[in-house]
UniProtKB/Swiss-Prot annotation:
GO terms for cellular component: chromosome, centromeric region; nucleus. This is Centromere protein M. The keyword Nucleus applies. It comes from Danio rerio. Probable component of a centromeric complex involved in assembly of kinetochore proteins, mitotic progression and chromosome segregation. The keyword Nucleus applies. Keywords: Centromere, Chromosome, Nucleus. It is found in: Nucleus; Chromosome, Centromere.
Length: 186
């Protein structure tokens, strides 16, 4: 089983591909539709997966994936576990501005706060950004889609040379606060 690598295929002209990975598919379809419907200056392919690794079938026909988004529902432990297990199927080059975590239900109770801390630690250990999204309203889904499109544009190399994926990574990385660092080091 090969690792998913961001540079194994040649990019298509004026086209970017985002892979949305969500175990429960609660937000995945809404977000995919919002991304496709947003007005943009480039073509966007949206691919959906429940988990990684991707199936070997149609590997040659699959486009280059410019951004991988792990959608984690904080109400579900299984959602977090699926994202954690999927990370092992990514090549290390993916973690330079090509992966992010999108979390939902961050305001729902104490269990979600514990899982949010776990996601933030996971993201910080891989130098990936964490985006919180409201998936219960159309405006929340639209705002999340717009943020992902901005990140996708940079990760696909469709912005001026001064803004690279590495630069984006330094701007959006999940930094640990001092109390999280203490927990992380223990």
């Amino acid at each position: 089983m090969a690792l998913l690598s961001p540079y194994s295929k040649v990019p298509e002209l004026n086209t970017a591909t985002v892979l949305l990975v969500e175990n429960e598919e609660e937000l995945q379809n809404k977000l995919a539709n919002a991304i496709v419907q947003h007005e943009k200056d480039f073509n966007v392919n949206v691919r959906l997966a429940k988990k990684l690794p991707l199936p070997v079938e149609n590997k040659e026909a699959r486009p280059r994936i410019d951004l991988i988004v792990f959608i984690v529902s904080l109400l579900s432990e299984r959602s977090l576990q699926s994202a954690e297990s999927s990370l092992s199927h990514l090549h290390s080059d993916c973690f330079l501005g090509k992966v992010c975590f999108l979390v939902t239900d961050a305001r729902c109770g104490s269990h979600t706060q514990e899982r949010l801390v776990s996601v933030r630690k996971l993201a910080a250990s891989h130098h990936c950004p964490v985006i919180c999204a409201e998936h219960r309203t159309a405006d929340g889904v639209s705002a999340a889609a717009l943020r992902l499109l901005n990140i996708l544009q940079v990760s696909a190399g469709m912005t001026p040379m001064s803004t690279t994926a590495l630069y984006l990574s330094t701007l959006t990385r999940c930094s640990l606060t001092s109390d999280l660092q203490e927990d992380y080091l223990q």
